[in-house]
Amino acid sequence: MKLTNKAILEKANAAVTAGDNEEFLAFCTEDTEWNFVGEHVLRGKEAVREYMRKAYVEPPVFRVETLIEEGEFLTAVGQISLKNEAGKMIDYAYCDVWRFREGKMAELKAFVIETGSK
C-alpha cells in the first residue's frame, strides 16, 4: 500500500526525532531543495545532511498542530524546539510547505519564527 504524503512526513519526523537523520533523508529526493524563507536555501541531499548535522546538536522536538494535504503538497504547522551550540533550547513556530515527487520529499518552503528559549 502506498503511503500518503502525510504518513511519509510523519515517518520522516519520527526518524529525525529519534536522532536518525539518515532515515529521514531516505524520505527525500536526491535533488531536494529546502528554502528557509528570508534566510537561506539548501540544494541537494548532501546540503541538507550537513545542515542537519550542525542544526540538530540534539534531535529536535516537534509538536505538529496541523497537517493539510492537497495533491503533491503537504502543509505542516507547529512548534519545534532545537538546542543551540551553547546547549540552550530555543523554541520556534513554523509553517512548512512540502512538495512531494514519486513518494519522496522534493521541496520545502519553511517559514520559521523564533518564539523563545528555555
Spans of features found by a protein language model:
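Short, well-ordered alpha-helical segments enriched in acidic and aromatic residues
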Residues: 18-35
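A beta-strand edge to alpha-helix "cap/lid" segment located at domain peripheries
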Residues: 1-4, 8-17, 35, 39, ...
